[in-house]
């Protein structure tokens, strides 16, 4: 389930 974690991290970083 690291896929969803990676997606969340990417979305959080993209929000910058």
Curated annotation (Swiss-Prot):
Keywords: Ribonucleoprotein, Ribosomal protein, RNA-binding, rRNA-binding. One of its GO terms (cellular component) is ribosome. The keyword Signal does not apply. GO terms for molecular function: rRNA binding. Binds directly to 16S ribosomal RNA. Belongs to the bacterial ribosomal protein bS20 family. This is Small ribosomal subunit protein bS20.
